[in-house]
């Protein structure tokens, strides 16, 4: 039996506690990083981007900032870009194309650095009143989605043919699109 000194035992106990604390801290940091990455993934899905955009975290934040400025301008101008409505009779509101055009005309580029971004006019910009923003301007619009024209009824989008009384009820009636 080897005799141990009192101090030696305390050192080993402290080492075990340190290892456990480090493991807990690492676990918390991994969880925090995962939550942050999940939030960026969601943000990347919500903001429109161009295929040439490198969607790093900082670039994602820059595009999100640009998109907020764009939506604010759309709200102030009644969903008009440079005096023209962004509503298309066939495709609805195409925020993706309008945002890309706005970004290009305002000098925002995928590689813009902090020195190239326009300065803020004021430190505090109050949010617009929720009732003053048209609902169709608030909906996030990924590149593959467009809004239907306002007040267009579902039956106009999906016409239903009237059944022929002489036809077999088990037979499908073709739909004739207008």
From Swiss-Prot:
Residue ranges of every copy of the bHLH domain listed in the record: 20-71
Tissue specificity statement from the Swiss-Prot or TrEMBL entry: Expressed in defecation-associated muscles and neuron-like cells in the head at the L1 stage. In later larvae, expressed in SM cells and their descendants. Not expressed in differentiated body wall or sex muscles.
Effect of mutating residue 29 to Q: Dominant negative effect on function in transcription regulation and mesodermal cells fate specification. Impaired vulval muscles development
Gene3D superfamilies found in the cross-reference section: Helix-loop-helix DNA-binding domain
Any one GO molecular-function label of the UniProt entry: protein dimerization activity
InterPro entries reported in the protein's UniProt record: bHLH_dom, E-box_TF_Regulators, HLH_DNA-bd_sf, Twist-rel_bHLH
SUPFAM superfamilies: HLH, helix-loop-helix DNA-binding domain
GO biological process, alphabetically ordered: developmental process; mesodermal cell fate specification; positive regulation of DNA-templated transcription; positive regulation of transcription by RNA polymerase II; regulation of transcription by RNA polymerase II; vulval cell fate specification
Effect of residue 28 to G: Impaired vulval muscles development
Alphabetized UniProt keyword annotations: Activator, Developmental protein, Differentiation, DNA-binding, Nucleus, Transcription, Transcription regulation
Subunit field text: Efficient DNA binding requires dimerization with another bHLH protein. Homodimer. Forms a heterodimer with hlh-2.
Function of the protein: Acts as a transcriptional regulator. Involved in postembryonic mesodermal cell fate specification. Activates ceh-24 and egl-15 during mesodermal patterning.
Alphabetical list of PANTHER family matching this protein: BASIC HELIX-LOOP-HELIX TRANSCRIPTION FACTOR, TWIST (PTHR23349), PROTEIN TWIST (PTHR23349:SF50)
Record's protein name: Twist-related protein
Organism for this UniProt entry: Caenorhabditis elegans
Organism classification: Eukaryota, Metazoa, Ecdysozoa, Nematoda, Chromadorea
Gene: hlh-8
